[in-house]
């Protein structure tokens, strides 16, 4: 439970967790990231998000797939970050990546159906198919996207461009700079 962590870190990476925090806890989550991040640290938050205005969670998904989950909009995430000492050093919206990912997950699910049916009933199989197809469509039609937020306390903690990502060895140097 991230709320029980007291140690500070120079790097924090959160992948696919924010969606499970729930809307009522967005500000609490970012306050905790702020508290856990050292003054010269960098946090990377990877989350699914609404690419348009804030929207409620599907009642079906809330009931059957992710109870209490919430897909935030970028405006909601930004508002929560603004209430901390952190600033968004970089924001990237991965537009076309997650739809094909969900399609591959669905293909793998279908290929594994004999094993799945040993563990789950037909109701689960139908619900999971529906979930994967609906989410794939949401990404393909750009209702949802994936956001990468790079957060920091200090401007000097992060490079001024993304060039380091594409230079051999430089990415590793950045990742291990604090060691």
Model-predicted regions and their roles:
Residues 12-13, 33, 136-139:
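Ligand-binding pocket scaffold of soluble enzyme catalytic domains
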Residues 27-42:
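A short glycine-rich, Lys/Arg-flanked "PGG" loop and its adjoining helix->strand segment in the class I
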Residues 26-29, 45-47, 53:
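Serine-hydrolase catalytic core recognition
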Residues 15-19:
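Residues lining the SAM
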Residues 4, 20-21:
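A short His-aromatic
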Residues 163-179:
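Short, cationic low-complexity segments
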Residues 2-13:
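A short acidic, Gly/Pro-enriched loop at the edge of an enzyme's catalytic core
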Residues 48-159, 173-174:
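Substrate-binding/catalytic lobe of Class I Rossmann-like enzymes that use SAM or dcSAM, i.e.
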């Amino acid at each position: 439970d991230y709320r029980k962590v007291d140690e500070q870190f120079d790097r924090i990476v959160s992948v696919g967790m924010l969606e499970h925090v729930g809307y009522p806890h967005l500000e609490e989550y970012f306050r905790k990231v702020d508290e856990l991040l050292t003054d010269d640290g960098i946090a990377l938050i990877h989350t699914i998000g609404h690419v348009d205005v804030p929207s409620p969670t599907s009642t079906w998904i809330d009931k059957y797939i992710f109870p209490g989950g919430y897909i935030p909009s970028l405006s909601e995430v930004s508002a929560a970050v603004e209430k901390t000492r952190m600033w968004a050093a970089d924001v990237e919206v991965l537009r076309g990546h997650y739809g094909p990912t969900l399609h591959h997950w669905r293909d793998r699910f279908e290929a594994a159906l004999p094993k799945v049916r040993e563990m789950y009933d037909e109701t689960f199989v139908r619900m999971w198919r529906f979930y994967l197809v609906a989410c794939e469509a949401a990404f393909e039609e750009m209702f949802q996207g994936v956001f990468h937020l790079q957060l920091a306390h200090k401007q000097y903690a992060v490079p001024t461009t993304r060039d380091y990502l594409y230079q051999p060895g430089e990415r590793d140097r950045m990742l291990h700079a604090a060691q």
